[in-house]
Regions:
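Short, flexible helix-loop junctions that flank or precede catalytic/ligand sites
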Residues: 1-345
Length: 345
């Protein structure tokens, strides 16, 4: 069995992911659900060869040393894929996330119009959050593409691995891959401040040093995009502050209250008629929100977001209501993800 055939089948069926696991048939995820491909199970030796065929020597060495590895894999004329290879009890496994060759625009994504206002700023931290598979990378790529078409600046991305490939339009774009073009997010961010960027995208805010450097970059006149695996704006603020030791928390609250521009927490919903669409909680850093961050009153954020629709804010439930009203999402699907399930009875 050839990996290119499996990946072509994945793309042809509009799947978001291909899952390979020794001892089982390949499976694909379509509109959020896993489906088996109607082929025989792949045994351990064949699976190992299949997964290894997608790696270069450096990636194979990492896989053998660390027992898992992340990398990108390109099939010319088909798509790019973000790959995580790992070991499991039956042998080798791998997850291939499809990254389309064409970057979707904010219009393609039916993104709220406030997204353009959020990113049209001279400086500040913009966080796009949500669980794995919620479309964070796709949303960020659309935001970066919008800036690339409309701003004459320098965009620098730091990713692990590089997902969407951006061609320079109005902007100069440089994309750096961790372990290939730089040793770590930290090293790349430290260096970034000397590379004259206007916009910096940090693939993931994984640790205290990366968060610290991202906040500093946002404070010193850069637009900084970052992602976290948090499900709401309030949890995002808590997560950012909680990575710091106790004695630094007050200072970080102050820094974050000054530099934050917005938090977009998104989740993917099954669309009526097939496909998926994102629902968003959107928190804009208004003076009231900045005060709540500074004074450690995160619990009051939800009501501030609820009443902030006039400036483009939206709770998840408000976003779900709008998707239901527009006929994009069915009520039972909205109820499944809603905070107040009774509202979608």
């Amino acid at each position: 069995m050839d990996i290119t055939e499996l990946l072509a089948f994945t793309v042809k069926n509009n799947a978001s992911d291909l899952h390979l696991s020794a001892g089982l048939p390949p499976m694909i995820r379509v509109d959020g659900d896993i489906h088996r491909i109607n082929v025989p199970a792949i045994e351990a030796k064949e699976m190992s060869d299949l997964v290894y065929s997608t790696m270069n020597d450096h990636q194979r060495r990492d896989f053998e040393a660390e027992l898992e590895v992340d990398f990108s894999y390109n099939v010319p004329g088909l798509a790019r894929f973000r790959v995580n290879a790992y070991h499991q009890d039956r042998g080798t496994g791998a997850a291939f996330r499809v990254i389309p060759n064409e970057i979707w625009t904010l219009e393609d994504l039916q993104a709220p119009t406030v997204f353009r206002d959020i990113i049209d700023v001279p400086r500040g931290l913009i966080l796009v959050t949500g669980p794995t598979g919620s479309g964070k990378s796709t949303t960020l790529a659309a935001m970066v593409d919008h800036l690339n078409k409309n701003v004459a600046g320098h965009i620098l991305t730091i990713e692990d691995p590089i997902e969407f490939v951006h061609n320079s339009k109005k902007c100069l774009i440089n994309q750096r891959e961790v372990k290939k073009d730089t040793l770590s997010f930290n090293a790349a961010l430290r260096s970034a401040l000397r590379e004259d960027p206007d916009i910096i995208l940090v693939g993931e805010l994984r640790d205290v040093e990366t968060v610290r450097l991202a906040l500093t970059a946002a404070e010193t006149g850069h637009v900084v995009f970052g992602t976290l695996h948090t499900s709401s704006a309030a949890k995002t603020i808590d997560r950012v502050i909680d990575v710091f030791p106790g004695e630094e928390k007050e200072m970080v609250r102050s820094m974050l209250s000054e530099s934050l521009r917005a938090v977009v927490a998104q989740t993917l919903m099954k669309k009526v008629g097939g496909g998926r669409v994102a629902a968003h909680e959107i928190m804009i850093a208004t003076p009231a929100i900045r005060n709540l961050i500074r004074e450690d009153k995160v619990a009051q954020m939800y009501s501030a977001i609820q009443t902030g629709q006039n400036v483009g804010m939206s709770t998840l439930d408000q976003s779900l209501s709008e998707l239901v009203r527009r006929g994009l999402v069915a009520k039972p699907e909205a109820r499944r993800k809603a905070v107040d399930k009774k509202a979608f009875a």
